[in-house]
Regions:
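A short helix/loop element that forms part of the nucleotide-sugar donor recognition site in Leloir-type
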Residues: 3, 187-202, 257, 386
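Carbohydrate-associated surface elements
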Residues: 161, 180
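Aromatic "clamp/platform" in nucleotide-sugar-dependent glycosyltransferases that forms part
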Residues: 270, 289
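Conserved acidic donor-binding segment of nucleotide-sugar-dependent glycosyltransferases
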Residues: 321-322, 326-333, 342-348, 362
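A conserved mid-protein helix/loop that constitutes part of the nucleotide-sugar donor-binding site
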Residues: 27-35, 207, 211-230, 240, ...
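Short His-centered aromatic/hydrophobic patch
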Residues: 102-108, 130
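Short hydrophobic beta-strand element within catalytic cores of glycosyltransferases
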Residues: 306-309, 319
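N-terminal strand-loop element at the rim of the active site
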Residues: 3, 9-15, 19-83, 247
Length: 388
């Protein structure tokens, strides 16, 4: 509920903002909440968090430590469990929030119902951030999201590609805010390169191709494994390292065994220190079929890693083909292998791309993106009652 306004149209206290998300695992959208909590203007925003899935808690403690209060689990059995909707309604009603900022189209469907069930004068403004291209979502999710989206909502997209993929009624009012990274802070991890390579058992003359991505179908791991088989056959001294966990872990390990990759491909599981692991890489690879604006890719650029990535979503907004890395078509393991072999055998080209990568990362400023989101909060909070 927007309180009494001061002369400039803003409340006389920090805005009470509730971030609503499916879970607090280690995915990109979840990492953005941590980033916003870290760099927020505490005089403007007092954030709270509500998340659906009790099994997804990796980042809950970090958000609490950064001042998000409360961090509430809605204890849903799944995203489609309707019982979380009245629970969210109670959280919003009791917290008297000014803004509800939703970070998933599926979650947005129920969150809108929770907000609209409140008395009109008690309804917070709604902001929805679209983190992935529209086609990556299930048809039923797309239908229900479009059906429930309100004209008074504010929509943010993490990349131009995401915005362009949205249905017309949403696309025409969506704003692009590309998030960023703290490149200087990330680069401090490079001092641990030798130590981390030692832990992974990597020889000095071995080239490491690494990735950081959840083990889900959209991340293209089966393609990467097929490509890895060809790269190892053609180059010999190349190792693959993958950090991440997810529902496909057993299937991917079985595929790795069938391909005979042995110790040439290592699944590390979830690593809280994933950026430190990345410091051991020589090439960063992302084989995704869908992406919005991958945070791991931005972290790789900050570390000065040349990139081989699929040209999907907002990837091309970060990588110019032939400059910071090489772009290939999705679901084409032969193209992926060719690009990886080319870079693995050409250290001078990798070094040149590393310089471009660092320069590109310097333009991706995390505090700037947080300020842009908070400017949106200020704008919608200063507007007197609109249609909700």
């Amino acid at each position: 509920m927007i309180p009494a306004h001061s002369a400039n149209g803003l409340p006389d206290r920090p805005l009470k903002v509730l971030w609503v998300i499916k879970g607090l695992g280690a995915g990109g959208a979840e990492q953005l909440l941590v980033q916003h909590a870290r760099y927020r203007d505490a005089s403007l925003v007092a954030p709270s968090v509500a998340y659906l899935l009790p099994q997804k808690t990796t980042l809950a403690a970090s958000l609490e430590h950064l001042g998000c209060s409360p961090v509430v689990c809605l204890s849903a059995r799944s995203s489609w469990d309707p019982l979380w909707i009245p629970r969210l309604r109670r959280v919003i009603r009791d917290g008297q929030f000014d803004i509800v900022h939703i970070h998933s189209p599926l979650v947005a469907i129920g969150a809108r119902l929770a907000v609209r069930s409140l008395p009109r004068r008690s309804r917070p403004r709604i902001v929805v951030t679209e983190h992935n291209v529209w086609s990556s979502h299930a048809p039923l999710t797309r239908f229900a999201d479009g059906l429930t989206a309100g004209r008074a909502e504010t929509h943010l997209a993490v990349s131009g590609a995401v915005r362009d993929s949205l249905p017309g009624s949403i696309r025409e009012r969506a704003r692009v805010i590309r998030y960023g990274v703290d490149a200087a802070e990330l680069r401090t991890e490079t001092q641990h390169r030798a130590e981390e390579r030692g832990r992974l058992g990597i020889a000095d003359d071995e080239v490491v191709v690494g990735t950081v991505a959840n083990l889900r179908a959209t991340k293209g791991y089966p393609d990467l494994l097929v490509a890895a088989k060809e790269v190892v056959r053609r180059t010999g001294a190349v190792r693959f390292v993958a950090a991440g966990r997810g529902p496909l872990e057993d299937d991917l390990r079985a595929q790795k065994d069938r391909l005979g990759l042995g110790d040439r491909f290592t699944f590390l599981g979830y690593r809280a220190d994933a950026v430190r692991v990345m410091a051991a890489f020589d090439i960063f690879c992302l084989a995704s079929h869908y992406e919005g604006l991958p945070i791991a890719l931005m972290e790789a650029l900050a570390l000065g890693l040349p990139v081989v990535a699929t040209d999907v979503g907002g990837v091309a907004e970060l990588i110019t083909d032939g400059q910071e890395g090489v772009l290939v078509a999705p679901a084409q393991p032969a193209q992926l292998a060719e690009a990886l072999v080319s870079l693995a055998l050409d250290p001078a080209r990798r070094a040149a791309m590393a310089e471009h990568a660092r320069a590109r990362a310097d333009t991706l400023d995390a505090p700037r993106s947080v300020r842009e989101v908070e400017a949106v909060y200020r704008e919608i909070a200063s507007v007197e009652d609109a249609a909700r």
